[in-house]
Amino acid sequence: MKQIESAKNQKVKDWKKLHTKKERTKTNTFLIEGEHLVEEALKSPGIVKEILVKDETRIPSDLETGIQCYMLSEDAFSAVTETETPQQIAAVCHMPEEKLATARKVLLIDAVQDPGNLGTMIRTADAAGLDAVVLGDGTADAFNGKTLRSAQGSHFHIPVVRRNLPSYVDELKAEGVKVYGTALQNGAPYQEIPQSESFALIVGNEGAGVDAALLEKTDLNLYVPLYGQAESLNVAVAAAILVYHLRG
């Protein structure tokens, strides 16, 4: 194991850069923090590149060959991590391969900008047993630190890929997958829609909703009725209600 004392060490500087999308894209790697996320990443062979700890006892046993471990001083570890009260362990991971096999139950996300909302929806899609999460233009970075923390390891369980949504919707429909949008106008209460063996659900931007051009391509648009005085539901909450209803 290598030890690093200084927060000015070049490795520390390189790891810190992974908080930026530019560096994540350049290196095809990302940083995770906390014991749970590291445990989930280690369940996927070939994902973890480096493990960073403050305490040697935090190093997981039975590591894959080739994973480099570093023990960092308090200052060096704090310089790398993003959370205010960081845990004792972090890891640098390779980006998962963007594989999108034949998907029969899919969540499509159009221009959702809040990383916390995105992470929650990835976690929901994983919990509901969907086949993939597909991100369109304008959607937050899936490997932003807040997105990763909100998803709680679901990035390692379900494909999260970027696609041109209009083109992908056309592909799904050609394969016989029913595509649902989310909109009040020309929409139906979700309770009226039967469960389905295959479906794609599109959820949209927190303020503007799903792009009008996408809504024109859907088979049907759904909404969650509001019975109180709230103007709307959080997009991640609405997505959870609809996904669980559609999948049955």
From Swiss-Prot:
The effect annotated for residue 206 to A is: Loss of activity
Question: SMART domains of this UniProt entry?
Answer: SpoU_sub_bind (SM00967)
- Domain description: Contains an extended N-terminal domain, which probably binds RNA, connected by an interdomain linker to a C-terminal catalytic domain, which adopts a typical SPOUT fold.
Sequence positions that bind S-adenosyl-L-methionine: 123, 204, 224, 233
Q: Which SUPFAM superfamilies match?
A: alpha/beta knot (SSF75217), L30e-like (SSF55315)
Under Enzyme Commission nomenclature, its number is: 2.1.1.-
So what family is this one in? Answer: Belongs to the class IV-like SAM-binding methyltransferase superfamily. RNA methyltransferase TrmH family.
Q: What are the GO MF terms of this UniProt record? A: RNA binding; RNA methyltransferase activity
Cite the Pfam families for this sequence. Answer: MRM3-like_sub_bind (PF22435), SpoU_methylase (PF00588)
What do mutants without this gene show? Mutant strain lacks G2553 methylation in 23S rRNA. Loss of the gene does not affect growth nor lead to ribosome assembly intermediates accumulation.
Question: Which species is this UniProt entry from?
Answer: Bacillus subtilis (strain 168)
Q: What is this protein's record name?
A: 23S rRNA (guanosine(2553)-2'-O)-methyltransferase RlmP
Localization per Swiss-Prot or TrEMBL: Cytoplasm
State the oligomer form and interacting partners.
Answer: Homodimer.
> Upper lineage ranks?
Bacteria, Bacillati, Bacillota, Bacilli, Bacillales
The terms describing its cellular component in GO are:
cytoplasm
Looking at the UniProt entry, the stretches that span the membrane are none
| Function statement | Specifically methylates the ribose of guanosine 2553 (G2553) in 23S rRNA. When the target G2553 is mutated, is able to methylate the ribose of adenosine, but it cannot methylate cytidine nor uridine. Modifies free 23S rRNA but not the fully assembled ribosome nor the 50S subunit, suggesting that the modification occurs early during ribosome biogenesis.
Q: Which GO terms describe its biological process?
A: methylation; rRNA processing
Q: Report the domain of life of the source organism.
A: Bacteria
For the protein in the UniProt heading, the enzyme class is transferase
Signal peptide span: none
Task: Enumerate the catalysed reactions.
Answer: guanosine(2553) in 23S rRNA + S-adenosyl-L-methionine = 2'-O-methylguanosine(2553) in 23S rRNA + S-adenosyl-L-homocysteine + H(+)
Keywords, A to Z, come to:
Cytoplasm, Methyltransferase, rRNA processing, S-adenosyl-L-methionine, Transferase
